[in-house]
Amino acid sequence: MAAEPVIVEAVRTPIGKRGGALANLHPAYLLGETYRELLGRTGIHADCVEQIVGGTVTHAGEQSMNPARNAWLTVGLPYETAATTVDCQCGSSQQASHMVANMVAAGVIDVGISCGVEAMSRVPLGSGSKHGPGKPWPDEWNVDLPNQFEAAERIARKRGLTRENVDSLGLISQERAAVAWAEERFKRETYAVQVPTTEEEQAAGQGMWRLVDHDEGLRDTTMEGLARLKPVMPTAIHTAGNSSQISDGACAIMWASKRMARALKLKPRARIVAQALVGSDPHFHLDGPIDATRAVLGKAGMSLRDIDLVEINEAFASVVLSWAQVFDQDLEKVNVNGGAIALGHPVGATGARLITTALHELERRDKEFALITMCAGGALATGTIIQRL
């Protein structure tokens, strides 16, 4: 039986930097506490949640063996709730959100959670793979799938982007994120995570635990400071100042049928207008958000003029600038509170984080439509248009 899936709540952790405040937390605990926060905000019993679909990129070590399920059990939630963890690379939790919404729409479940977690400090990207993803290629394969850095450089060359262009976006991201935190724009979408203190902090009388309530990746920088950063390769333009960060974090979104939301006295806050998972040219695979944007706009019968806010993941500055150049867009409504360059990119959690941020900002601005898109490893890209209700 068909039903209309709606978002009733969405919350994320602050994003921790590499080796930062969240680095001592097991990913199961990080996501598990996010589940508990989500349930606490809705006020419903955990028994109401029928299925969970989570996203993680590096399925190894502490993130192996279905972390979405492990996290649920780790914090003592009912074992009857089923969970699946998917791998769609950086698009994992965005695609997980599509999957949960689709299960609700199909009448398979009435209440579900989509989520994502990545503890990159503890489980480095690519862990468990000796040669890298899918390598060595069989001789008969003709695959030109560059690493992420080279992919970013390729689209920069294709679009004629300069070092100044990408540094400028890096600065904009930092400045917007700083303003967003100063104005408490992220306060509703985040919760304070309890973390163990260091020996030095305990010696200073801080106790055994402290609360982390802000994203850690923000930096006070300038164009001059960014220009001094060296790229990995002499001829390249991407540096640590105009690329996403290695991060730790989790995010969770609760979905329900409109009928069940009413029965549980939960406010429907948004719905999906259109969704897409697309394959893109492996040679230029970080241009995938361009293909995903065309796909969701086409499915929705909309144009970018109809979109109030855009969240496009800042994996590298060239991803956003290439997208903007192709669609002839300025950045006025793109990543209005900064992006992954400033906030961080806990890869498996970022898709859900982008949806969460877009929803809260639509509500804050009293706007209606947001487009969320991101590139993903393996020459994939995800796209979602949500409508605030």
Predicted feature descriptions by range:
Residues 23-111, 117-135, 190-212, 283, ...:
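Conserved beta-ketoacyl condensing-enzyme motif
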